[in-house]
């Protein structure tokens, strides 16, 4: 899983290369295999505060959780009194063809918390934590804060993004473009798998070829694009 690079989020991120330069990190975190319901069942108990998952794992190669996993996660977390947190930082705000990727994968699941950033601001830095039900009452005024939280410019940008996605039917457009790209990519020599939803796409290449991201970055840089 990848949940961020600041200390709290980094503690929830599995990749050693990101973690090691900043260790020791906050503890009390257990990693389990994504999509493994039995592993989840074994890990959850009354001492667990929350489960955090990406509906489509970006850093892992654009791999979505299998059918039924989020439903099981919701049922199991409720049974032990743990929060279900869905990280939609990469997959949310329309990138998957829906406002949230979990709307596609598990339409009936309502998480306690959703985390958002990236596409929320349309290029302006902003992050948000959306909480529902009892989880929404866990933090009150003065308990936690950030210097630039509620920044009016960033919030105005987020409102403009939401309005644009709605007014221009961009969710439909994302689905159309994603389907077209997937078809075109699947026809390219050396491509053996196209994964993802909407415009959140991962490409698997035949053995012996460089990673797809490396090839794409080289071609984009040659054409004058800045690539991260």
Model-derived features with residue positions:
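Conserved N-terminal phosphate-binding loop of PLP-dependent enzymes in the Aspartate aminotransferase
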Residues: 1-228
């Amino acid at each position: 899983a990848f949940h961020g690079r600041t200390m709290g989020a980094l503690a929830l991120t599995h990749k050693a290369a990101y973690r090691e330069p900043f260790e020791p990190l906050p503890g009390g975190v257990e990693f389990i295999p994504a999509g493994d319901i039995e592993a989840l069942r074994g890990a959850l108990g009354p001492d667990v505060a929350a489960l955090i998952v990406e509906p489509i794992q970006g850093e892992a190669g654009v791999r979505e959780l299998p059918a039924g996993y989020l439903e099981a996660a919701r049922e199991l977390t409720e049974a032990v009194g743990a929060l279900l947190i869905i990280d939609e930082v990469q997959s949310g705000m329309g990138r998957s063809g829906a406002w949230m990727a979990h709307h596609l994968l598990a339409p009936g699941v309502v998480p306690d918390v959703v985390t958002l950033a990236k596409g929320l601001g349309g290029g302006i830095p902003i992050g948000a934590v959306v909480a529902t039900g009892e989880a929404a009452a866990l933090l009150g005024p003065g308990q936690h804060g950030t210097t630039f939280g509620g920044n009016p410019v960033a919030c105005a940008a987020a409102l403009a993004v939401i309005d644009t996605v709605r007014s221009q039917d961009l969710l439909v457009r994302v689905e159309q473009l994603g389907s077209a790209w997937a078809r075109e990519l699947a026809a390219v020599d050396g491509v053996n798998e196209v994964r993802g939803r909407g415009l959140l796409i991962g490409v698997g290449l035949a053995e012996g070829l460089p990673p797809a991201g490396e090839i794409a970055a080289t071609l984009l840089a040659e054409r004058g694009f800045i690539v991260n």
